[in-house]
Amino acid sequence: MGKTKNTSLDAVVTDFILLGLSHPPNLRSLLFLVFFIIYILTQLGNLLILLTMWADPKLCARPMYILLGVLSFLDMWLSSVTVPLLILDFTPSIKAIPFGGCVAQLYFFHFLGSTQCFLYTLMAYDRYLAICQPLRYPVLMNGRLCTVLVAGAWVAGSMHGSIQATLTFRLPYCGPNQVDYFICDIPAVLRLACADTTVNELVTFVDVGVVAASCFMLILLSYANIVNAILKIRTTDGRRRAFSTCGSHLIVVTVYYVPCIFIYLRAGSKDPLDGAAAVFYTVVTPLLNPLIYTLRNQEVKSALKRITAG
């Protein structure tokens, strides 16, 4: 059990113990190696995309690739907030995290995660303008406007993370301190609160639901218009290139949003599949982003070849 501090009112939790993901003991070493390799590949893959964007003047001046570079930066940080603790889950050591560390992790997890939600929406809007309004695209979406929109996404994400962290840790925690999860996240932490959590669960449902649902609906609306525009393209090659560009984004969005909706719109429930679902958008998605966008994007591949060729 973690440390507690006696007060005149009750015992106050000063740290939490992360129980991690359920796994067979005989697979501990293998899982440690797998997640460690995934983490290293995630960092290297996203760093490679960032360096490619910065090294190629043609790419770093275009909104589509500015957004892709920001996504890679977010993926690196989101992965660093969650995966190292998940890796420790497969070691014999006790996975204790200080109370303040738990607060910080929950804040950054939701800050970065919600910022990523907003960024996916901006990426869909950018593709909508590029395909549906090609002649007006340079006016409607330029580097300066893209920078302002990205800054707005960061501010909105920070506000979302602050709201969730404040609401979660304003509650008293005076009893059990074992978090049945691999990170400090809202549903798992709320189960340990020494107070009624109905209001928190409702706010989580509404707040996360509004952010996720509104972003997802805007993305679907953008792609409905995009598909309609693509079907009007007369050349087969033109349709193929447009679908290829948009297909990468749709794959990433699906892998990210479906697990989020599964977990946070059921905040009061306890499902053993929650941990597996969370692995998708905390571990798998940051790894897939550089692979999908690199392998399916001819311009990125060409830029990589130019850089590696010197």
Swiss-Prot record:
Topology Extracellular: residue spans: 1-29, 81-104, 166-202, 264-274
Show the InterPro entries listed in the entry: GPCR_Rhodpsn, GPCR_Rhodpsn_7TM, Olfact_rcpt
Keywords from the UniProt entry:
Cell membrane, Disulfide bond, G-protein coupled receptor, Glycoprotein, Membrane, Olfaction, Receptor, Sensory transduction, Transducer, Transmembrane, Transmembrane helix
Its placement in the membrane is given as:
Multi-pass membrane protein
Ranges of the Cytoplasmic topological domain: 51-58, 126-144, 223-242, 296-310
Gene3D superfamilies cross-referenced by the UniProt entry? Rhodopsin 7-helix transmembrane proteins
Q: Which residues are glycosylated?
A: N6
Which cysteines link up through disulfide bonds? C102-C194
Q: Name one Pfam family in it.
A: 7tm_4
Q: Where are the transmembrane segments?
A: 30-50, 59-80, 105-125, 145-165, 203-222, 243-263, 275-295
Q: State any single GO MF term.
A: G protein-coupled receptor activity
**UniProt-listed PROSITE patterns:** G_PROTEIN_RECEP_F1_2
Major site of localization recorded for this protein: membrane
Write out the function statement from the record. Answer: Odorant receptor.
Describe the family membership recorded for this protein in Swiss-Prot or TrEMBL.
Belongs to the G-protein coupled receptor 1 family.
Q: This protein is called what? A: Olfactory receptor 10G2
The record lists the organism as Homo sapiens (Human)
